[in-house]
C-alpha cells in the first residue's frame, strides 16, 4: 500500500464514526475506492473495515469499488460482499472498448452469481485515460450504458460527468497525474448540463 495509508489500528474508531453517522440511513457501504487489492496488507485493511461494518450494520449492503478494468477478486472478499461492482473505466484504446460486455461475462463465468453494477463506465466529456487526446461524448456513454446492461449489469450502471466528479472550478489547476492521466475537465458548472445525463435518467 502507498504512503498515507490509514494505520490498521485506526480503522476501528473510523468505522465506528462512519456507522454512527450514516447507518441510520441504510446506505450501501462501498468499502474501497479504486483499489487494486494488490497485496495482503491492502486486503486485510479493507476486510477489517468490512467486518466491523457488517457487525455494526448487518442490514446495510456492502461491495468494493475496484480499479478500472480489473476482474480478479480475492476469494475471501467474493464470499463477503453482497453485490459486485466493476468499472470499465475511461480508456479509449481499441483493446478496452469491449470491456463493457467482457467484464460482466467474466464475473458470471468465474464467480458465484450476485447482482452486478458497472460502477464507472466512461464519464461524459472526461479526457481519455493514458494521456490520449480526446473525450467521451454522449454517444460513447450511451453505448457503454447499453452494452453494460445487455451484458449483465443487472443491478445497474452509474453516470459520471467530467468536471463534476472532481468539482473542478474555473481557473483551477488540474494535474494530468491524477487518475490515469486525464485532460483538464470542464468546470462543474458546465458539466452539470451535459446532455448525456438525460440518457441515463
Regions found by a protein language model. Name each.
Residues 19, 50, 101-108, 145:
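Short amphipathic alpha-helical segments and helix-helix/interface helices
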Residues 11-12, 44-47, 99-102, 135-143:
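Charged helix-capping and loop-helix junction motifs
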Residues 115, 124-126, 141-201:
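Aromatic- and carboxylate-lined catalytic core of secreted/periplasmic carbohydrate-active enzymes
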Residues 27-31, 61-64, 82-86, 115-123, ...:
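Structural recognition of the beta-strand scaffold that forms the well-ordered cores
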Residues 20, 55, 109-110, 150:
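Solvent-exposed polar/charged
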Residues 35-36, 80-91, 103-143, 167-168:
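Active-site clefts of carbohydrate-active enzymes
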Residues 1-83, 87-94:
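Active-site mouth of glycoside hydrolases
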